Amino acid sequence: MLFQVGGEGTRPTFFEMAAAQQLPASLRAALTYSLGVFALRRSFLHKILDYEDEFFAALMLILEGHSLRTTDGSFAESLYGLRRKSARLRLRKDSARKDSSEEVQHSGLEKRQRILSVVFLVVLPYFKSKLHAIYNKEREARLRESLWGAEDQGFDEADFFTGDDSIVSREPSGNEELSVRVQLATKIKKFIAVCYPWIHASSEGLSFTYQLLYLLDATGFYSLGLQALGIQVCRATGQELMDTSSRISKIRNHERERLRGPPWLKTVQGALLSCSYAVLDYAQTGLIAAVFIFKMMEWWYQSAEERLSAPTVYPPPPPPPAPKMAKEGIPLPPDRSLCALCLQKRANPSVVTVSGFVFCYSCVFKYVSKYKRCPVTLIPASVDQIRRLFQDT
């Protein structure tokens, strides 16, 4: 069995399908992060972040609906040059061999398939994100209660399925009796918290199975939703792209012809339609380009801030000038390896730290102990300012 990774024919590769599937999630993460940064200076954006799921669902509803209506492909699929086609199996008979085989026939999408595609692309992910949020809240509540030793068991399975009606309120006024509505909401949240892990595991397992079968070229459907709708994703040919452009032009001309009212109202409506068409035409590339530019600017300013916040490293200062030799001091020998006191090669070299001159340890120790000064510069010194030097062999 061969892996389906090549780019031949109208069948998209596994990597094209995976990239198209992951694009909406990546786009949502980038938009959420961008809005979070802008909300630091524009407080009204916090209202959008409070309804993040609804905002993104409405945005994707517009983009997906427009893309399916004009290009027969989802928002992400149209970026990769992919199209959705209705797939029907037809039994093909071979009279010579007297056997039969199945042949897939592709045709344009029906209205029902477009509507259900929007449901699978927008509505179901929206409900899944809401269920995931409820599950996380209930899980955090249970962990918090277990940490503080609360009596409420959160979404414990045994507590739910045994039908125990004793519900402890998480509010400070826990002794008050909860209303029927609150009790029902609590039961629903418990039910979601118990069932969501199984729903999520089943969904991910089916998704992985279909993706593996698609990679192995064992099926033409990339997901269960596509098979349920009878839709296969194919590469768009050059002729299909031209037909799509002409179809979009016909749809827009028909919408302009349907305008009614006085001339000034038609002009306003036509201008609004032109603006909406321009926004929808450039929404795909413009949205992704805006996020890309924002991330580039963020990286640029972050690098500049790191450079400004980094400690300034100055070059090391030049060494101080050597102390001058006193006229009454002991002169230095021409050979620098000789001791100025005994005029012999230095044994156990030691330095006087106040001046930096090196002598034999025994010679300089006796001299400094007696005269309390450096032999060459006559700078006051003590035996505590004598340091022995050791050389690596």
Swiss-Prot record:
Disulfide bonds: none annotated. It is a multi-pass membrane protein. It is found in: Peroxisome membrane. The chain crosses the membrane at residues 14-41, 45-69, 111-148, 169-214, 286-312. Residues 42-44, 149-168, 313-393 are cytoplasmic. Expressed in young seedlings, roots, leaves, seeds and flowers. Disruption phenotype: Embryo lethality at the heart stage. InterPro entries: PEX12, Pex_N, Znf_RING/FYVE/PHD. GO terms for cellular component: peroxisomal membrane; peroxisome. Residues 1-13, 70-110, 215-285 are peroxisomal matrix. Pathway: Protein modification; protein ubiquitination. The three subunits of the retrotranslocation channel (PEX2, PEX10 and PEX12) coassemble in the membrane into a channel with an open 10 Angstrom pore. The RING-type zinc-fingers that catalyze PEX5 receptor ubiquitination are positioned above the pore on the cytosolic side of the complex. The RING-type zinc-finger is degenerated and only coordinates one zinc ions, preventing E3 ubiquitin-protein ligase activity. PANTHER family: PEROXISOME ASSEMBLY PROTEIN 12 (PTHR12888:SF0), PEROXISOME ASSEMBLY PROTEIN 12 PEROXIN-12 (PTHR12888). This is Peroxisome biogenesis protein 12. It comes from Arabidopsis thaliana.
